[in-house]
UniProtKB/Swiss-Prot annotation:
Keywords from the UniProt entry: Amidation, Antibiotic, Antimicrobial, Disulfide bond, Secreted, Signal
A Pfam entry, by short name: Cathelicidins
Protein name as it appears in the record: Protegrin-2
Xref: InterPro entries: Cathelicidin-like, Cathelicidin_CS, Cystatin_sf
Sequence similarity: Belongs to the cathelicidin family.
Gene name in the database record: NPG2
């Protein structure tokens, strides 16, 4: 009888531990890839934007050297382009087509790969266009042309 009771108690503890393991995500499951962190930054840009249409990732610059700590801010540089989807639709930007002659923005800043910590520090500036076959990024009256 005592063995049966101990076995039943052990079974309950095993069940509780199993449920706890399923509920508490592991640290590795909480880490985002570099691209996922950038897509999260694009989502944040769309949430905070007052513009009519959503933006979608157009180009992602090379990720920085590997860093084991997902909570450490990583430098990031990417380009987004305006889509045909109105912002209020809340449609995932990846499902939206790019708008012909839509606005293009160059974004720089830092992201973390940790899903729990969510510090993003991103600044986006509109790309003013192409000058003599070169892509130019302008901020106020100062432009940098590449290419």
């Amino acid at each position: 009888m005592e063995t049966q009771r101990a076995s039943l108690c052990l079974g309950r503890w095993s069940l509780w531990l199993l449920l706890l393991a399923l509920v508490v995500p592991s640290a590795s499951a909480q880490a985002l890839s570099y691209r996922e962190a950038v897509l999260r930054a694009v989502d944040r840009l769309n949430e905070q934007s007052s513009e009519a249409n959503l933006y979608r990732l157009l180009e992602l610059d090379q990720p920085p050297k590997a860093d084991e700590d997902p909570g450490t801010p990583k430098p990031v540089s990417f380009t987004v382009k305006e889509t045909v989807c109105p912002r209020p639709t809340r449609q995932p930007p990846e499902l939206c087509d790019f708008k012909e002659n839509g606005r293009v923005k160059q974004c720089v800043g830092t992201v973390t790969l940790d899903q729990i910590k969510d510090p993003l520090d991103i600044t986006c500036n509109e790309v003013q266009g192409v000058r003599g076959g070169r892509l130019c990024y302008c901020r106020r009256r100062f432009c940098i042309c590449v290419g």
